[in-house]
Structures are given as C-alpha cells and as structure tokens.
C-alpha cells in the first residue's frame, strides 16, 4: 500500500515538472511570478498626477 502511494506521488511530481518545463519552453515565461522572474512584453508606466 505504501509503495503504491509513493509511486503515485512520484508520478504526480514528474508530470508537474514536465508541465513547468513545457510552459517555459513554449511560452518563454514562468509559472508563478516571483522576485527572480523577468517579465517580458509588459510596460509599466507611472501616472503623471497623484490622486491625493
């Protein structure tokens, strides 16, 4: 029983890793934005006047 659970967990982790690699290869992005992630194709601009 314990062996089956470990095998299922290993299978799930492998599929998750493959999905992450596929997203990075195909879309050139990251799965979850973080401080080390680079944003591409996004331009952020400041407002010229503060509402306060």
Curated annotation (Swiss-Prot):
Function: Lysis proteins are required for both colicin release and partial cell lysis.
Signal peptide location: 1-17
Organism listed in the record: Escherichia coli
Assigned keywords, A-Z: Cell outer membrane, Lipoprotein, Membrane, Palmitate, Plasmid, Signal
GO biological process: cytolysis
Lipidation (S-diacylglycerol cysteine): 18
GO CC terms in record: cell outer membrane
Membrane topology recorded in Swiss-Prot or TrEMBL: Lipid-anchor
Domain of life per record: Bacteria
Gene: cnl
Lipidated sites in chain (N-palmitoyl cysteine): 18
InterPro entries: Lysis_col
Subcellular location: Cell outer membrane
Protein's recorded name: Lysis protein for colicin N
């Amino acid at each position: 029983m314990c062996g089956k659970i470990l095998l299922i967990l290993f299978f799930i982790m492998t599929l998750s890793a493959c999905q992450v690699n596929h997203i990075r290869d195909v879309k050139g992005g990251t799965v979850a934005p973080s401080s080390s992630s680079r944003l591409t194709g996004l331009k952020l601009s400041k407002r010229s006047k503060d509402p306060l």
